[in-house]
Amino acid sequence: MPNFFKFHTVIERHWQKPYPVLSFLLKPLSGLFAKIAAKWRADFLSGKRQSEKLSVPVVVVGNIHAGGTGKTPIAAALVSGLQEKGVKVGIISRGYGRKSKAVYVLNAASRAEDAGDEPLLLFRKTGAPTAVGSSRVEAGRALLAAHPELELIVADDGLQHYALQRDVEIAVFPAADTGRTDLDLLPNGNLREPLSRLESVDAVVVGGRAADGFMPSEHLFGSRIEAGAVYRLNRPSEKLDISTLSGKRVAAVAGIARPQRFFDTLTHMGIRLDQTVALPDHADIFNRDLPPADVVLVTEKDAVKFSDGICTDNVWVLPVCAIIEPDLAEFVLERLEGVPKAV
């Protein structure tokens, strides 16, 4: 794992600031990937490959990047917005990082190893019925069988899962990439589909402030992340007074796509970090990963990975939420021509 993690770190740095030698080696592979990705989508659109439709409308929230776009808070905000408008909404996802590929409907006792960290976080934050499965179609069917009252399904990270027909497509795009001209497809870059794909989605949500002139879609939404009050993992009602951290050893642990963003957020909040630990995205967290510190800060996504066997008395969680403008939930319902009804 350490060697793979080191290699993956080099590649991720290359994606952000390309190394000429790596670009020379990887560019031909990106050209091949582009052809494969284009044919894959074309086969579904033409009917050469079979796609299936669920009995309720499906809204896909995904991206053309290989992770790290801040999609999960956007999906949570959309689901919450739909719930506030009275829509009975469910969530389906693949469930990266879990132990099984079988379809699984989440419940109050679900763990990250059963459902994956992101679906479990969405389930706990929104309370929306949630199912995971490598086949989004099967996950959707299982969810509707368990919750026939649902009127709409949000498919988390399903933009490239063309086997599932969708009624609305929403792509999340990081603000840091809105002004770049050196983006490329995998493996030379971190795009799963070309930028032109954004022209065919219903809406693009930019995570942060977009560069001037970035207008890939007629319907462009802005978003920002707001941090909530830090709470103790094993006693969520207990909040952390940041002013009390003076003189204490403080560490931060993150197993997300871009851990430095989490560390920077804590620093901007006025928290001095004595140690940071960056783990691979979706990685399990064990006692050995927690540094010796008076306070260990983690993300919400990592918090759901903690099991009963891990000492968590000194672990605190930073919750975040996405603010999307204008109203994305309202846009979705207008796109669907009113509140959908289950059949």
Curated annotation (Swiss-Prot):
Keywords: ATP-binding, Kinase, Lipid A biosynthesis, Lipid biosynthesis, Lipid metabolism, Nucleotide-binding, Transferase. It catalyses: a lipid A disaccharide + ATP = a lipid IVA + ADP + H(+). The keyword Lipid biosynthesis applies. Pfam families: LpxK. Its EC number is 2.7.1.130. ATP binds at residues 65-72. GO terms for biological process: lipid A biosynthetic process; lipopolysaccharide core region biosynthetic process. PANTHER family: TETRAACYLDISACCHARIDE 4'-KINASE, TETRAACYLDISACCHARIDE 4'-KINASE, MITOCHONDRIAL-RELATED. Transfers the gamma-phosphate of ATP to the 4'-position of a tetraacyldisaccharide 1-phosphate intermediate (termed DS-1-P) to form tetraacyldisaccharide 1,4'-bis-phosphate (lipid IVA). NCBIfam families: lpxK. Belongs to the LpxK family. This is Tetraacyldisaccharide 4'-kinase. The lineage of its organism: Bacteria, Pseudomonadati, Pseudomonadota, Betaproteobacteria, Neisseriales.
